Amino acid sequence: MVELRLPSNSVVKKGREHKAQQKMLKPRKVKVYRYDPDLDENPTIDSFEIDLSKTGPMVLDALIKIKNEIDSTLTFRRSCREGICGSCAMNIDGTNTLACIKPIEDISGDIKIYPLPHMKVVKDLVPDMSHFYAQYESIEPWLKNDSPAPSNSERLQSIKDREKLDGLYECILCACCSTSCPSYWWNGDKYLGPAILLQAYRWIADSRDDNTGARLEALEDPFKLYRCHTIMNCTKTCPKGLNPAKAIGRVKNLIAERHGV
């Protein structure tokens, strides 16, 4: 029998409780994952009581309130607050999403917040995105065209060709989809994952790019592409409503067509 043991410092323990100092009109408890690698201690779940009557409507508003008024050491990423930049991607109430567009009212009971799953944690709710970005760089996500550029205009495309990019270019690389994918959890060192494969197809589908063959050859690998088993977590969790699984399927179809299948 195989015995699997977690490292001793991986067990999440109960952390500090920050109780309300005064009566609240709309009290709500927020439970947040805390981890600081510099302390060489187990991660914990800290509990904070906040007044929703004095807090904005989104989960990110609650985190900002906690950081500003209760515990300034709480660490998380955020920027646009409009679901555009992808900085505040995290696991909220068991689902990967963006804290800035997740309404508190959609959550019943305690608000439970963790970093994106199966990624190294820099601190608290901040995941290490370096491997994810390296995978993105590996697909060469820029227009590649070996023909001379037009002298008096940009490289143009028809309205119909432009529409082929809808549902692809909107990806904000938040990694919600990839970190919800069990195949990426198991083979993330080699499998590119839903987000990167959707981005790869974005350039394959672009009529202005003439490196389609080379791009497909680069993806034709048992691990890079074919670890996708259509589990569909990626499509379900995408905060932009995109369909990475569909894009992956199209890449597989194009490769099959190249081999006459």
From Swiss-Prot:
[4Fe-4S] cluster binds at residues 171, 174, 177, 238. It comes from the Bacteria. Keywords: 2Fe-2S, 3Fe-4S, 4Fe-4S, Electron transport, Iron, Iron-sulfur, Metal-binding, Oxidoreductase, Transport, Tricarboxylic acid cycle. [3Fe-4S] cluster binds at residues 181, 228, 234. Pfam families: Fer2_3, Fer4_17. Its cofactor is [2Fe-2S] cluster; [3Fe-4S] cluster; [4Fe-4S] cluster. GO terms for biological process: respiratory electron transport chain; tricarboxylic acid cycle. InterPro entries: 2Fe-2S_ferredoxin-like_sf, 2Fe-2S_ferredoxin-type, 2Fe2S_fd_BS, 4Fe4S_Fe-S-bd, 4Fe4S_Fe_S_CS, Beta-grasp_dom_sf, Helical_ferredxn, SDH/FRD_Iron-Sulfur. NCBIfam families: dhsB, PRK05950.1. This is Succinate dehydrogenase iron-sulfur subunit. It comes from Rickettsia prowazekii (strain Madrid E).
